[in-house]
Amino acid sequence: RPTTMVIKDSVRHYYPIKQGQQLDIMFTITNTGDAPLVISDIQPSCGCIILDKNSHIIIPEEGIRQFKATYNSIKNIGEVVHRIRIFGNMLPDGKAELTFDVNVVPDADYTRDYEELFQEFNAKNGIVKEMVDGKESELGYYVGTP
């Protein structure tokens, strides 16, 4: 049976954080209807958001439940906007959404680009030798006309 719900502060603007920091987001869902609220799924818009939740959640009539999401900013710089979608038996169309934005500030000393991060990752995992001593047909570039 459908019910109604409210997400407290469903649109949020967080203060800037430094790249690499994690942002813990607590959100509160209140079942304002007269039937149990059955949440069948909670989906973040990005793999950088980890949810602390069960797969199937029931909130009784007039009940309140808090959820925690953790945003990892390691791969972002600048203004980011993310959404957390909630699916269940809520009116009017079975879905609700929490939206948040935050400005991820790079380290003031130096900002590494993607190639440097990729090279650092490969060096830690022992892949550099394979990249340097690869086969001639696997160099990743060509000379002359294609």
Locate each region found by the language model.
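Long, low-complexity ectodomains and other extracytoplasmic segments of secretory-pathway proteins
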Residues: 1-21, 28, 91-146
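Asparagine-centered strand-capping/turn motif at beta-strand->loop junctions
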Residues: 29-33
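A short beta-strand micro-motif common to beta-rich folds, especially ectodomain repeats
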Residues: 79-90
